[in-house]
Curated annotation (Swiss-Prot):
This is Argininosuccinate synthase. The keyword Repeat does not apply. The lineage of its organism: Bacteria, Pseudomonadati, Pseudomonadota, Gammaproteobacteria, Enterobacterales. Homotetramer. The gene is argG. Belongs to the argininosuccinate synthase family. Type 2 subfamily.
């Protein structure tokens, strides 16, 4: 059976991921006019720039949908976001600033929950608005087929008939008006934005050029912290975790994770926390550039890793970072539910996150400028009395340290012999002054 359909399957049910924007509105209306039977599915992901979710399915029905459903994905989205924090599933960082994989997390939830809803309605053909150059076309493909093995894919933006008739936003707008819908294009921005309640992605258009900075972006989850005219007073915030799960902000306990994330967004957003500018590698290994917002994720991540470093030993922390980066890449590629990802998630949540209990107090200032004011946990292995510089009882003595250093002579001797072995083969040069072979200065060799 052909998985990807290049032309409209006339007379068949097609589920379309319907946002209510111009692209999906025109596509839905066009498919109905050409003889398909479109079903519209809208994901409520808590998008900060969406004002009225209930109106979206109504518009879909007006444009010819056989049926239209609004699927509440917020609870599942926040659950996956917390899991990503517990696992450190983030692989794109620049200068210490992290992209929290908020779009890949949203696609994992949307791609599974919408296709599951379609399956309930007997709809086995799925269309969405992703383009062939991006990551989402592969993410949705993978998640869709994982959820429904019988699924076929039809994307209007891969159909030459659709492209020939409605190849641009102007043509789509004219098409809607000609069909009796007073649909006016929204004001064109200098970039494109995609968002969910975990974060926002700004990319494309002017942001494709690296001489266009964050300063052209109008944040939808935070503030323009780079604008000195924007007043941002410092603020203290306390975050509490229990067994790896964020449960309280500023002493207020949340039984609803969605409400907790919304409050974390509000707190971090007041300062512009979590904004970053990243050059990343798409799934097809071409580089792209995005500017990201994730105020709540950033706040929780900072507090989580502060507790992590005070609770776990060095080797565990090293494995957390290594496996977290690996898991983040799998998430980015649309493999969040693949077996290799589940294996990494299980080990990180079971052996790392389960011990993360405690409170962290921070002072937030402008952007990603903050200070950690206090860290409290019953599980801390940080014990200041062990290494105090003050006189008093100690867990080990000077003689103990002499013995420990003496044992180091074994590997120091081995290392010295290797250095001289490298010098004999020409990999290192001998040093008359230090007595230790050294890497040659390439400048002296004219290289």
């Amino acid at each position: 059976m052909t998985t990807i359909l290049k032309h409209l399957p006339v007379g068949q049910r097609i589920g379309i991921a319907f946002s209510g924007g111009l692209d999906t509105s025109a596509a839905l209306l066009w498919m109905r006019q050409k003889g398909a039977v479109p079903y519209a599915y809208t994901a409520n992901l808590g998008q900060p720039d969406e004002e009225d979710y209930d109106a979206i399915p109504r518009r879909a029905m007006e444009y010819g949908a056989e049926n239209a459903r609004l699927i509440d994905c917020r609870k599942q989205l926040v659950a996956e976001g917390i899991a990503a924090i517990q696992c450190g599933a983030f692989h794109n960082t620049t200068g210490g600033l992290t992209y929290f994989n908020t779009t890949p997390l949203g696609r994992a939830v949307t791609g599974t929950m919408l296709v599951a809803a379609m399956k309930e309605d007997g709809v086995n053909i799925w269309g969405d608005g992703s383009t062939y150059k991006g990551n989402d076309i592969e993410r949705f493909y993978r998640y869709g087929l994982l959820t429904n093995a019988e699924l076929q894919i039809y994307k209007p933006w891969l159909d030459t008939d659709f492209i020939d008739e409605l190849g641009g936003r102007h043509e789509m707008s004219e098409f809607m008006i000609a069909c009796g819908f007073d649909y006016k294009m929204s004001v064109e921005k200098a970039y494109s934005t995609d968002s969910n309640m975990l974060g926002a992605t700004h990319e494309a258009k002017d942001l494709e050029y690296l001489n266009s900075s964050v300063k052209i972006v109008n944040p939808i989850m935070g503030v323009k912290f780079w604008d000195e005219s924007v007043k941002i007073p410092a603020e203290e915030v306390t975050v509490r975790f229990e067994q790896g799960h964020p449960v309280a902000l500023n002493g207020k306990t949340f039984s609803d994770d969605v409400e907790m994330m919304l409050e974390a967004n509000r707190i971090g957003g007041r300062h512009g926390l979590g904004m970053s500018d990243q050059i990343e590698n798409r799934i097809i290994e071409a580089k792209s550039r995005g500017i990201y917002e994730a105020p709540g994720m950033a706040l929780l991540h900072i507090a989580y890793e502060r507790l992590l470093t005070g609770i776990h030993n060095e080797d565990t922390i090293e494995q957390y970072h290594a496996h977290g980066r690996q898991l983040g890449r799998l998430l980015y590629q649309g493999r969040w539910f693949d077996s290799q990802a589940l294996m990494l998630r299980d080990s990180l949540q079971r052996w790392v996150a389960s011990q993360i209990t405690g409170e962290v107090t921070l002072e937030l200032r402008r952007g990603n400028d903050y200070s950690i004011l206090n860290t409290v946990s019953e599980n801390l292995t940080y014990k200041p009395e062990r290494l105090t510089m003050e006189k008093g009882d100690s867990v080990f003595s000077p003689d103990d340290r002499i013995g420990q250093l003496t044992m180091r002579n074994l590997d120091i001797t081995d290392t010295r012999e290797k250095l001289f072995g490298y010098a004999k083969t020409g990999l290192l040069s001998s040093s008359a002054t230090s007595g230790v072979p050294q890497v040659e200065n390439l400048e002296n060799k004219g290289q």
